[in-house]
Amino acid sequence: MSKPVFFLLNLFLCGTSLCFSQILRVGPYLQNASPNTMTVMWETSIIDESIIEWGNSTVLGNSTFGTFVTGSGMSKVHTVQLTGLIPNSRYYYRIHTTAIEGQTFDFITPPLPESEKNFNIVSMSDMQQDVAHPEVFSDIINADLIPFVDERYGNNNDLAYNLAYVFIPGDLV
């Protein structure tokens, strides 16, 4: 194989691999939980559909379409609102688009306020991004927070059941 063809082939293969590894940049993550709704958001590096497959079992069975806006650096921030949910119930969801079939995650909707059912929250300080130490937040969550919650409120290591809400106020306070 000639050097120019070999170079172009390597460039194509490496570029394709890099492209696919950069499609999902952030998330998915949950926002604006209420007893009957949940907003799922994620960020990609390409324009793609905004679809969440979801249901009350891992079989899923429902699809809801959403929207996206252009974020910083031309990233696309996707938003899908799930509606008609039952309070204090577990739901499973995943991103499903033309480029991504994501991992299945789960959440539990908050109880109705009048039920006065207890649930646990965590309030954390603004973590700020530190490019010199990008894994600090993940390390704190995985090495400290999750084991603490499981030990303190343990329910078979079911984080969605043990921890209902995480509040990171940032510059809001």
Where are these regions (language model features)?
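Bacterial Sec-dependent N-terminal signal peptides
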Residues: 1-23
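Divalent metal-dependent phosphoesterase catalytic cores across multiple superfamilies
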Residues: 22-173
